[in-house]
Amino acid sequence: MSVAEYARDCAAQGLRGDYSVCRADFTVAQDYDYSDEEQAVWRTLCDRQTKLTRKLAHHSYLDGVEKLGLLDRIPDFEDVSTKLRKLTGWEIIAVPGLIPAAPFFDHLANRRFPVTNWLRTRQELDYIVEPDMFHDFFGHVPVLSQPVFADFMQMYGKKAGDIIALGGDEMITRLYWYTAEYGLVQEAGQPLKAFGAGLMSSFTELQFAVEGKDAHHVPFDLETVMRTGYEIDKFQRAYFVLPSFDALRDAFQTADFEAIVARRKDQKALDPATV
């Protein structure tokens, strides 16, 4: 799909982002010219969320925040990329908003993480329909400083297109959703912690997912994850719990995706409440 075609589709859906300045790979310049109000919104979001992440986030996420410096002001993507390259070889690229699957996977395969270059308004502190800079940056980027998870994300980008070609587009999306977006981890002898970006950037769901008495925690199994439906605009009805990032990487490396997709692609998605 061309940039122009995708821009028309996004406009028809009421999505934000200036796609008129996109390059062929859907990247744009960050154009660091944010208003005082945008900087204030960023600080408000970070101040509020870090009160929770300090208690509920996995240590690799917290280490990433400290090493990359994301809290005091809207980050300069190139400055953070310089730090991130030294840690795991990843870099940050600016995009106008959501981008098509193919270029997204290509960026991941080359250790480039797309980050939206605009920020939600003060009226959207609690909920925003589409991913913005706070979700992409505060949510996703810190854990990319963790070498094993960073490796998984690159492997995902390299393999996703092949899995889609097999007919597993919904299945590979579910895997991303339940790991990169809503993943939990509980290492041996340690309390349950969160790392997924959808949780890191949500004040209410982060608390529910980790501490809620009604949160449904399920041991991670790659094939089960790929079969389980998910929620878009409400709290998840299941959260998959990794024993470690190594377990995620190893499961992905050793999975026979051709066999999994052939076996499961025509089956109805599992109800997350009953997995």
From Swiss-Prot:
It comes from the Bacteria. Keywords: Iron, Metal-binding, Monooxygenase, Oxidoreductase, Phenylalanine catabolism. GO terms for biological process: L-phenylalanine catabolic process. InterPro entries: ArAA_hydroxylase (IPR001273), ArAA_hydroxylase_Fe/CU_BS (IPR018301), ArAA_hydroxylase_sf (IPR036951), Aro-AA_hydroxylase_C_sf (IPR036329), Aromatic-AA_hydroxylase_C (IPR019774), Phe-4-hydroxylase_mono (IPR005960). Fe cation binds at H135, H140, E181. CDD domains: pro_PheOH. Its EC number is 1.14.16.1. Pathway: Amino-acid degradation; L-phenylalanine degradation; acetoacetate and fumarate from L-phenylalanine: step 1/6. Belongs to the biopterin-dependent aromatic amino acid hydroxylase family. PANTHER family: AROMATIC AMINO ACID HYDROXYLASE (PTHR11473), PHENYLALANINE-4-HYDROXYLASE (PTHR11473:SF24). This is Phenylalanine-4-hydroxylase. It comes from Mesorhizobium japonicum (strain LMG 29417 / CECT 9101 / MAFF 303099). The lineage of its organism: Bacteria, Pseudomonadati, Pseudomonadota, Alphaproteobacteria, Hyphomicrobiales.
